[in-house]
């Protein structure tokens, strides 16, 4: 059954940043067994494991913005547009909070070392949580990847995306991407990746 939008506001309860009385009330409900704690400060008003997965997948941005403030959806996840349909890992770049995983019902966040939000990255509403810009995505996905499901989508995926951009927006857009990527590469330490990207665009 589809949950009405009004009801969904209460399916995830977060104590971080909440007024003290609200946070204490949530903690009391959890202690009484009314709520399920899925991460520090994050609770669900649901016990069924499959329903928990569905709730987390509906609210993953809000949840991860609390657990990893300042993170950027990056690499393969940015290339794919966010959370994959098969429930795979989502890669988040963060300058200080990295080399760890956060396992939630239905979602695994993989934190990798990388810059926080940069010029061109998109912020999700009022959340301290971001989505990598297209030039940043292309650079990151040319970085070394380990295994078929590593953090980077790889050169073939980048080539395919460049062809799509060319067909949709023309050469000027590719040149704009190259100019922006050139500057980003300097601050991100991805000069070799930019050389690859430059060669692809120039080919």
Outline where the language-model segments fall.
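Hydrophobic alpha-helical interaction segments
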Residues: 16, 24, 116-203
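Short gly/ser-rich loop at a beta-strand->alpha-helix junction or flexible surface loop bordering the NTP-binding
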Residues: 2-133
């Amino acid at each position: 059954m589809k949950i009405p939008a009004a009801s969904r506001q209460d399916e995830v309860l977060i104590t971080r940043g909440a007024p003290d009385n609200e946070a204490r009330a949530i903690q009391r409900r959890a202690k009484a067994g009314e709520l399920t704690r899925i991460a520090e400060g994050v609770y669900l008003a649901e016990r069924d494991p499959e329903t928990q997965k569905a709730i987390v997948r509906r609210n993953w941005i809000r949840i991860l913005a609390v657990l990893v403030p300042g993170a950027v959806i990056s690499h393969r996840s940015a290339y794919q547009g966010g959370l994959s349909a098969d429930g795979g890992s989502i890669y988040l770049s963060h300058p200080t909070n990295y080399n760890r995983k956060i396992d939630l019902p239905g979602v695994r966040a993989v934190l990798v070392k990388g810059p926080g939000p940069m010029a061109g990255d998109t912020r999700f509403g009022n959340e301290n949580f971001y989505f990598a810009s297209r030039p940043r995505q292309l650079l990151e996905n040319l970085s070394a990847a380990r295994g078929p499901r590593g953090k980077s989508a790889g050169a073939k995926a980048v080539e395919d995306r460049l062809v799509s951009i060319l067909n949709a927006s023309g050469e000027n857009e590719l040149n704009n991407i190259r100019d922006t990527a050139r500057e980003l590469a300097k601050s991100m330490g991805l000069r070799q990746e930019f050389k690859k990207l430059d060669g692809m665009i120039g080919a």
